[in-house]
Amino acid sequence: MRSWFPHAPTVSVPEIEPEEALSYRDEIRTRVRSYAFGLDDWRAKVKTRRAYLRKVRDEDESEILRVYGALLTVAAAGPRPVRHLIAEGESAMAETALYALRHEDESAMSYPEERVLSDLYLWDVRVLERDLGLYAVHFSFPLIHRSPEGQKLKVLVWERASLEKVLKEVRSNRVLGVRVLDPSGWNDVWICPRCGATRRGGTGDLEQDHARRCSNCRGRMRKPDPNLLEMLKEPEGYLIMHFKTLARTFREDVRRLVVSDIESRDDVEDEELREFCLKLFPKVRKRLERVEKGAGGRFPPCIRELLRRAQEGENLPHEARFALAAFLVNVGWDVDRVVEVFSNLPDFDEERTQYQVRHIAGEVGGGTRYLPPNCDKMKAWGLCPGKDCGVKNPLAYYRRPRADDG
């Protein structure tokens, strides 16, 4: 399993044989239902997920992990998009638990809900270990507050602290940012204040070592926001973000970890498991066929690559989303079909995405249909795979005559 911290302890998710995975099918159905994929109302989704968290918090811990292992095995036997739906569901439940811990009163810290959050979602992302029933942070864990008296920053740093202590501070509305530090200084996790991306390592110089090298912001963030720099006078190098950004980054880390764990079981080939998986997610096959059918040889390499990344649930930067959506609407895809392409992204919001795609298509706003960026701009944004296609715009690649056109 990929980790920002190579030497961090991990919770062992048990390997499950296909036959045993099938024996957990009822509990897996319950877990999948808890994701509430079919519910449109966000509050209903959160309510459903929290109900499931309450259900499992009193279960035996090893049994919870076995059910989770069975879920990963089922996902590994199904079509590729399933693993990203599973990962999105797990990350959504993790985020729900994180918000629950933030907003509950202090007595909530004694509830097993903390155990569920830590064991299933935080084992690698925030470097936790079990120690006499507590969870300790291996690296120092700073939390940056805005003091009630004014604009000064208050920084709390623990070399070791129980998760209980850290989350008590995280629940405070005064928290502005978090950075996880390695004592050596070379395994620090930096969180980009613009896009929420995480990156490991560095010298500690915010502008030179992070802002200009963030792959998601390449080409558009030449230096940090001046307002951000003003807040970084003490101590220099800390990145500031609001709790929503922390939650989004945390959710993306969880999603990546779950996908990685599922992919480690890629050799699972069991027809019964596969059929069970397809019954759980009947729309997966149709969605996959629709996306792949449109991504034929006429699509340029850059667009095929962006389609692949979107289908796999990668958190695409804004420029990549715009380029992909603008290309698809200009080759005749309808709005709903384009929105469907982005549905696996970790921060997918159907209503917002539909509005943005309609705006690109010229259906709302000023009525202007936007063209995809030209190849020079795609290269500047880091979206060109490097192959010289001999055109100046992705649409030219799509429209040029081919031998099989007759």
Curated annotation (Swiss-Prot):
Family classification: Belongs to the eukaryotic-type primase large subunit family.
A GO cellular-component term linked to this record: primosome complex
Subunit organization: Heterodimer of a small subunit (PriS) and a large subunit (PriL).
Binding positions for [4Fe-4S] cluster per the UniProt entry: C302, C375, C384, C389
InterPro entries per the UniProt record, alphabetical: DNA_primase_lsu_euk/arc, DNA_primase_lsu_PriL
Biological process according to GO: DNA replication initiation; DNA replication, synthesis of primer
UniProt cofactor(s): [4Fe-4S] cluster
Database matches in Pfam families: DNA_primase_lrg
Protein name: DNA primase large subunit PriL
Record's keyword terms, sorted: 4Fe-4S, DNA replication, Iron, Iron-sulfur, Metal-binding, Primosome
Details of cofactor binding: Binds 1 [4Fe-4S] cluster.
Species of provenance: Methanopyrus kandleri (strain AV19 / DSM 6324 / JCM 9639 / NBRC 100938)
